[in-house]
């Protein structure tokens, strides 16, 4: 994955996602973090970039949909950032 894309994703995450998901955690539902094992267990579609993008776009439960708040480039960037953090156990 492109380093610039991940850097952009980190910025989008800090400005939009960190309020609930700081450090890959979940301040609303403690078990449903952004860590690898939790994503594999709870995210419909598992730990895939497409499943993360779908969740960001459409939301689910307490998580709002971001498709009307972020543009496609920001969603692509933040999804890649979350995926990279989870797959490589960086949270």
Curated annotation (Swiss-Prot):
SUPFAM superfamilies: Cytochrome c. Heme c binds at residues 17, 20-21, 63. It holds the Pfam family Cytochrome_CBB3. PROSITE patterns: CYTC. The gene is petJ. Disulfide bonds: none annotated. One of its GO terms (cellular component) is chloroplast thylakoid lumen. The keyword Translocase does not apply. The keyword ATP-binding does not apply. It is found in: Plastid, Chloroplast thylakoid lumen. Binds 1 heme c group covalently per subunit. One of its GO terms (biological process) is photosynthesis. Functions as an electron carrier between membrane-bound cytochrome b6-f and photosystem I in oxygenic photosynthesis. Keywords: Chloroplast, Electron transport, Heme, Iron, Metal-binding, Photosynthesis, Plastid, Thylakoid, Transport. Belongs to the cytochrome c family. PetJ subfamily. Monomer. GO terms for molecular function: electron transfer activity; heme binding; iron ion binding. This is Cytochrome c6. InterPro entries: Cyt_c-like_dom (IPR009056), Cyt_c-like_dom_sf (IPR036909), Cyt_C6 (IPR023655), Cyt_C_IC (IPR008168).
